[in-house]
């Protein structure tokens, strides 16, 4: 059991028959009354975020979460096939389980698959930055490197983001998966 006084950002708990990851927490000791802990929790099954206040000192059950490094090897209809990088076993995940991550997934990408009690898939963890190919963008004109203007670019996954005018079709760029923003050109082509 985990005491609410031992809460840390990133810890996972089982609460109300759901699995939550602690996003934020704050210990509050008011002048009158007993202390409490305000938390912001993400449901790992649904992705929804809730605010919940625990009384200080109560105990909650920890959730047994494991992360396994896997590589997306191919897509077959509505299923994404991942390979464990340690033992080469393959795992098939339906696109509906991948939700918001689809816009960043491409063949060859390494991700962490998150399991609850070693058998239930509750999500994936993307790298903070990924290198991805530009599938389409309007051509840039000569001298476009001098301004801070942006244009739309469609990436190989179908995601549309804003990029500088000097980026061309076929180039690899680095984007932040948390914000979805362009970071730089990938010079390691």
Curated annotation (Swiss-Prot):
- In terms of superkingdom, the source organism counts as Bacteria
Keyword flag Transport: no
- CDD domains reported for this sequence: S1_EF-P_repeat_1 (cd04470), S1_EF-P_repeat_2 (cd05794)
Q: Which InterPro entries match?
A: Elong-fact-P_C, NA-bd_OB-fold, Rib_uL2_dom2, Transl_elong_fac_P/YeiP, Transl_elong_KOW-like, Transl_elong_P/YeiP_cen, Transl_elong_P/YeiP_CS, Transl_elongation_fac_P
Q: Which GO terms describe its molecular function?
A: translation elongation factor activity
Pathway(s) served: Protein biosynthesis; polypeptide chain elongation
One Pfam entry for this protein is: Elong-fact-P_C
Q: Where in the cell is it found?
A: Cytoplasm
Q: Known SUPFAM superfamilies for this protein?
A: Nucleic acid-binding proteins, Translation proteins SH3-like domain
GO BP term (any one):
peptide biosynthetic process
Q: Name one GO cellular component term.
A: cytoplasm
Q: Which UniProt keywords apply?
A: Cytoplasm, Elongation factor, Protein biosynthesis
What family name appears in the similarity comment? Belongs to the elongation factor P family.
Job of this protein: Involved in peptide bond synthesis. Stimulates efficient translation and peptide-bond synthesis on native or reconstituted 70S ribosomes in vitro. Probably functions indirectly by altering the affinity of the ribosome for aminoacyl-tRNA, thus increasing their reactivity as acceptors for peptidyl transferase.
* Full protein name: Elongation factor P
Q: Which organism is it from?
A: Aster yellows witches'-broom phytoplasma (strain AYWB)
- Which taxonomic lineage does the organism of this UniProt entry have? Bacteria, Bacillati, Mycoplasmatota, Mollicutes, Acholeplasmatales
Q: Which gene encodes it?
A: efp
């Amino acid at each position: 059991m985990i005491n609410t006084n031992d809460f840390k950002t990133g810890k996972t708990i089982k609460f109300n028959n759901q699995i939550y990851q602690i996003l934020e927490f704050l210990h509050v000791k008011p002048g009158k009354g007993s202390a409490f802990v305000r938390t912001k929790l993400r449901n790992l099954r649904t992705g929804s975020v809730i605010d919940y206040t625990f009384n200080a000192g109560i105990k909650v059950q920890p959730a047994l979460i494991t992360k396994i490094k896997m590589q997306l090897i191919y897509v077959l209809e509505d299923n994404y096939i991942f390979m464990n990088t340690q033992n080469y076993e393959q795992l098939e995940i339906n696109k509906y389980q991948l939700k918001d991550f689809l816009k960043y997934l491409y063949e060859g990408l390494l991700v962490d698959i998150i399991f609850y009690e070693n058998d239930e898939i509750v999500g994936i963890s993307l790298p903070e930055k990924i290198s991805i190919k530009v599938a389409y963008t309007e051509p840039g004109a000569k001298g476009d490197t001098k301004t801070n203007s942006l244009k739309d670019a469609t990436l190989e996954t179908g995601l549309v983001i804003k990029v500088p005018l000097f980026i061309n079709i076929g180039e690899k760029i680095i984007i932040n998966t948390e914000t979805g923003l362009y970071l730089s050109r990938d010079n390691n082509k």
